[in-house]
C-alpha cells in the first residue's frame, strides 16, 4: 500500500529501482500498472492522477490496460507527468475480429530512465519495449482467461439450475 497525505493506493503492479538516486523515495514506484476490468473510466483516471500528480512522488509513468468485457478489445495507455498533470503519451488498441488480432498504435515503450531515474550507462541498459507480437500474446492470455471465466459462470449457473 502506497500512501500520500490523504489517501492510500495499491497498484495492480509497480516497479522501481532498488537503489534510487538521492532525493527519491526508494519505496515509491517509478512505473505503475493499473488494470481496468470492472472499474469505471473516472476511477481509472483518479488512479492515474494519484500516481502522477502528487508532490514528491517518483512515478514517471503509469501504464493502464482497459479490458472491454463485451468485445475482444484491450486499450493500453501510457501516462506521464507533464507540467504537474497526468498526460496521455501513448494509446495502443489490441482487437480481434474474425480470428485476426490487430495492434494499432505501435509498441509500448517504457524508457530506461523512466524506470531507473538515471540515464543508461551500459549497452544492455535499454528501454523496455513490448512490440506487436508480445502485445498480441498478452491480449490472447487475457481473452483466454475471460473465456474461462464465462464458461465457469455458465457451469455454475447450470449446476444451480439442476438443483431446483
Predicted feature residues:
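C-terminal interaction segment
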Residues: 1-164
Amino acid at each position: 500500500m502506497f500512501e500520500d497525505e490523504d489517501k492510500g493506493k495499491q497498484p495492480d503492479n509497480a516497479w522501481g529501482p532498488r537503489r534510487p538516486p538521492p532525493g527519491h523515495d526508494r519505496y515509491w514506484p517509478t512505473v505503475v500498472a493499473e488494470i481496468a476490468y470492472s472499474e469505471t473510466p473516472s476511477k481509472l483516471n483518479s488512479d492515474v492522477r494519484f500516481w502522477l500528480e502528487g508532490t514528491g512522488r517518483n512515478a514517471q509513468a503509469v501504464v493502464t490496460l482497459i479490458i472491454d468485457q463485451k468485445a475482444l478489445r484491450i486499450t493500453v495507455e501510457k501516462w506521464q507527468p507533464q507540467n504537474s498533470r497526468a498526460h496521455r503519451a501513448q494509446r495502443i488498441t489490441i482487437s480481434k475480429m474474425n480470428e485476426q488480432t490487430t495492434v494499432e498504435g505501435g509498441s509500448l515503450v517504457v524508457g530506461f530512465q523512466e524506470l531507473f531515474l538515471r540515464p543508461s550507462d551500459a549497452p544492455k541498459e535499454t528501454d523496455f519495449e513490448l512490440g506487436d507480437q508480445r502485445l498480441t500474446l498478452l491480449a490472447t492470455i487475457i481473452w483466454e482467461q475471460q473465456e474461462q471465466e464465462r464458461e465457469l459462470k455458465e457451469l455454475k449457473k447450470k449446476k444451480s439450475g439442476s438443483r431446483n
